[in-house]
């Protein structure tokens, strides 16, 4: 029996249908509703009604994520290598595969390994959870496109999922996690943003494996009740593998929960209306007002802990073009996304001002960047001017901007367009390696950068855009001003950049770290780009390549313990 007042009603009664979407009301069992949506959407209930641009976008995000992942393995980054190695300790003839292997292992182990690799560079897709066209969908939670490996794992387990169905499932996964990011801000309560992706992963994995709505509801309940990841992994200056692998570990738990539910384990039901689950715990809907400054947890307040709705309605698109994935953003290289506005401003200044692009490093007198919160606090902190690790450097506005400017000035000029300049100056993993990290020229430029918080004027424009402006002063008095940048290249609302061309360059840059020749690169990337036309048999090997034939690199982060002690 359900713990809360409204027992699940048939979809016609519980869902408020729109032409292209359903709404799961706050007073319905949304966990069961998400389950039914995933089953219906992936199963084709709504017909072939997805706009071609959506198919193209999901294919691009998936390819981008995979190229990030395999290049992180090629550069011997720690967590991806550890987790990939761990997966082989769990062989499963009915399992899934890690990148670069034809050996099957427990699906949750393949998922954790592949997701950790995808996230390691912090260079794959980003969502800001902001959709003002839907009432209540502006919570602004972060998120990243880390979870596509869940779909491929399910496809490999069943052997029955073709490329088009796999892409449809990826659209579904991004829709669920993206819309949850729009209605509930996890970071406001120090919960890591990856939980929304874990919920979506449980739903989609279950739907692909033929789970019932009740089994998926059970898995979502287990994921939320047992595996809430807090932002302790991101606190202060400490950096660990847990930060980059947070999505992977949460998704491992989600897939494991789904497998347990399909074996008959019954988890908590109706988790979004559960008063002691995170949603109503942090945003009460009965007995006390929602107040982020004061959460009333008085146990004697019976109304507070009694029956009530969830804190939000949830709209999920099933047809047309207004899918969550279409509002997600690409990174044109390696950088923290909050710096994208500054990088676009820099590229524009270099293209438009020959006096700047042909200057010498010593000609730069000072630079000032004006940004919004949270960018000012996250990557503009003065303490970030002395990064000592790759992970702290890619969250340092000073380092990121200085590195790109240094590359431009050392070239002695730039191309005539923003697109070609982005391609030439694109930041690669080597820009965050041990040598680059302590490059004296980069460090000298960093000391010339100052930051300002743009105040309410800038803050109000985020997360619709990435409001940033930049001034660069040369010795002798010349000043170059970017003006306000809102939608940099890669941003979902940017219409000026040739996104396909930029991503092709990025894919090639990352692929060159992995493959020794163009033939091997083309063989690997072609199925990713043409995934919609692949058969179920071809999906089985979509992540296969000869791991032993990869280009050989030293570990990008320096020497590490080479073997496990287990």
Regions found by a protein language model. Give the residues of each.
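Amphipathic, well-ordered alpha-helical segments in soluble domains
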Residues: 34-37, 146, 169-172, 176, ...
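Terminal-appendage/accessory-domain detector
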Residues: 8-140, 242-252, 259-566
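Short helix-coil transition sites and intra-membrane helix breaks within transmembrane domains
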Residues: 139-144, 190-195, 230, 331-335
């Amino acid at each position: 029996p359900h713990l809360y007042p409204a027992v699940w009603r048939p979809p016609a009664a519980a869902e408020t249908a729109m032409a292209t979407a359903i709404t799961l009301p706050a007073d319905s069992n949304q966990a069961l509703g998400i389950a039914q949506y995933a089953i219906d959407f992936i199963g084709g209930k709504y017909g072939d009604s997805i706009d071609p641009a959506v198919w193209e976008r999901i294919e691009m995000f998936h390819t981008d994520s995979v190229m990030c992942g395999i290049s992180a393995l090629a550069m011997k980054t720690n967590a991806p290598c550890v987790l990939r190695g761990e997966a082989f300790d769990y062989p499963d003839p009915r399992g899934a595969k890690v990148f670069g292997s034809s050996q099957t292992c427990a699906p949750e182990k393949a998922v954790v390994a592949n997701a950790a690799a995808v996230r390691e560079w912090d260079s794959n897709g980003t969502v800001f959870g902001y959709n003002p066209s839907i009432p209540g969908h502006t919570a602004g939670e972060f998120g990243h496109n880390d979870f596509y490996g869940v779909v491929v794992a399910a496809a490999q387990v069943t052997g029955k999922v073709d490329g088009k169905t796999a892409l449809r499932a990826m659209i579904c996964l991004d829709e669920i996690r993206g819309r949850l990011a729009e209605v509930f801000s996890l970071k406001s309560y120090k919960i890591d943003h990856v939980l929304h992706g874990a919920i979506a992963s449980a739903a989609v994995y279950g739907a692909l494996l033929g789970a019932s709505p009740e089994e998926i509801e059970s898995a979502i309940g287990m994921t939320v009740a047992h595996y809430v990841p807090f932002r302790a992994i991101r606190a202060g200056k400490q950096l660990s593998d847990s930060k980059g692998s947070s999505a992977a570990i949460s998704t491992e738990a989600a897939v494991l929960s789904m497998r347990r539910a399909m074996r008959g384990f019954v988890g908590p039901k109706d988790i979004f209306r559960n008063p002691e689950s995170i949603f109503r715990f942090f945003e009460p809907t009965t007995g006390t007002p929602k107040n982020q400054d004061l959460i009333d947890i008085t146990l004697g307040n019976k109304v507070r802990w009694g029956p009530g709705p969830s804190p939000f309605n949830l709209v999920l698109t099933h047809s047309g073009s207004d899918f969550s994935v279409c509002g997600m953003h690409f990174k044109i290289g390696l950088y923290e996304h909050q710096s994208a506005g500054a990088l676009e401003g820099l590229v524009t200044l270099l293209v438009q001002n020959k006096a700047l692009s042909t200057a010498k490093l010593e000609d730069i007198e000072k630079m000032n960047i004006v940004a919004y919160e949270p960018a000012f606090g996250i990557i503009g902190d003065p303490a970030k001017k002395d990064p000592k690790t790759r992970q702290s450097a890619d969250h340092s506005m000073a380092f990121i901007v200085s590195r790109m400017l240094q590359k431009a000035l050392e070239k002695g000029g730039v191309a005539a367009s923003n697109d070609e300049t982005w391609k030439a100056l694109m930041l690669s993993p080597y820009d965050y390696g041990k040598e680059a990290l302590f490059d004296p020229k980069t460090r000298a430029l960093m000391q010339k950068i100052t930051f300002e918080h743009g105040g309410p004027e800038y803050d109000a424009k985020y997360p619709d855009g990435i409001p940033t402006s930049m001034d660069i002063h040369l010795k002798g008095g010349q000043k170059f001003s970017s003006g306000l940048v809102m939608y940099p290249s890669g941003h979902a609302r940017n219409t000026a950049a040739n996104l396909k061309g930029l991503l092709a360059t990025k894919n090639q840059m990352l692929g060159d770290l992995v493959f020794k020749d163009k033939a091997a690169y083309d063989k690997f990337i072609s199925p990713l780009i043409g995934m919609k036309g692949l058969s179920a048999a071809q999906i089985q090997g979509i992540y296969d390549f000869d791991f032993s034939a990869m280009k050989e690199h030293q570990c990008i982060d320096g020497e590490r313990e080479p073997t496990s002690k287990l």
